[in-house]
Amino acid sequence: MVVKVGINGFGRIGRIVFRNAVEHPEVEIVAVNDPFIETHYAAYMLKYDSTHGRFKGDVKFSENGLDVDGKHVRFYQERDPANIPWAETGADYVIESTGVFTTTEKASAHLKGGAKKVIISAPSADAPMFVMGVNNETYKSDIKVLSNASCTTNCLAPLAKVVNDNFGLVEGLMTTVHSYTATQKTVDGPSSKDWRGGRTAAQNIIPSSTGAAKAVGKVIPSLNGKLTGMSMRVPTSNVSVVDLTCRTDKSVTYDQIKEAMKKASANELKGIMSYSEDALVSSDLNGDPHSCIFDATAGIALNDHFIKLVAWYDNEWGYSRRVIDLIAYIAGVDAGK
């Protein structure tokens, strides 16, 4: 079964989701909406990417859309999500990737145009959040609007799950060392809500807030209130790393932690988590499709209850792959599979 999908917002995540969808046998992008981009410019931005390189397929543009590897993708330029005629192309599932319509009420506007389900590619204040490999099995077909959470939550949640399932996670603090993103500045500029966030991205390490750790409590209810964290935005263009320092209920050695991560990555979290004992640096993970790459040689233990774990993630590519995986999964559930 091939699921027909539309994308609203052809920015960073929208385009990387598109690239991932081309590689996925169960998903077909049939329509894109972005009021700020002309069709020929959309083709250019899909074809060329400074971080992930040139698109491997064939991209052309026509008056009303894109032709990608011989398949036509309709292109709309509606500002109001309620006016996008998704039904014209049969787009049953819509990815909301503008970063603007992130509540259930706002994202539900897509349903008026014929979409059956809306997947928000960002955290949401009220829409149910799902992390593949962690809580996706709790999805029910009556849910119309859902969130794929954040890239950091998608990395942290599998990591925390393995610790909690095997050794009990009492409490933890997370720091994500995160590549800069489009919301940051190329030169110092005004940022009234976050003064530090207005400083030059390529010249500074910038402390920032993040709700990614607390969000783990929403996808793993038993960890609610046990995790919090912060972000350090750093001058790299892509790939980030989670540092989770936590206290375990059971006595554990670091070798036992490694073994649990290795086992999970080969079994229940296969395709979601990977395990590495290589001496990795961030650029080695560019384009990695996993949510969480456990770095076995980077972590340390203070004692048998207090450990520091390190896991990498491509905050663009890995996250976008999960958006597509989530759609394929919920479409299967909706079809009664």
UniProtKB/Swiss-Prot annotation:
PANTHER family: GLYCERALDEHYDE 3-PHOSPHATE DEHYDROGENASE, GLYCERALDEHYDE-3-PHOSPHATE DEHYDROGENASE-RELATED. GO terms for biological process: glucose metabolic process; glycolytic process. NAD(+) binds at residues 12-13, 34, 79, 315. The active site is at residue 151. Its main location: cytoplasm. The lineage of its organism: Eukaryota, Fungi, Dikarya, Ascomycota, Pezizomycotina. GO terms for molecular function: glyceraldehyde-3-phosphate dehydrogenase (NAD+) (phosphorylating) activity; NAD binding; NADP binding. Pathway: Carbohydrate degradation; glycolysis; pyruvate from D-glyceraldehyde 3-phosphate: step 1/5. It is an enzyme of class 1 (oxidoreductase). This is Glyceraldehyde-3-phosphate dehydrogenase. It catalyses: D-glyceraldehyde 3-phosphate + phosphate + NAD(+) = (2R)-3-phospho-glyceroyl phosphate + NADH + H(+). Coiled coil: none annotated. Belongs to the glyceraldehyde-3-phosphate dehydrogenase family. It comes from Coccidioides posadasii (strain C735). Transmembrane segments: none annotated. The gene is GPD. GO terms for cellular component: cytosol. Homotetramer. The record marks 178 as: Activates thiol group during catalysis. Keywords: Cytoplasm, Glycolysis, NAD, Oxidoreductase. Its EC number is 1.2.1.12. D-glyceraldehyde 3-phosphate binds at residues 150-152, 181, 210-211, 233. It is found in: Cytoplasm. It holds the Pfam family Gp_dh_N.
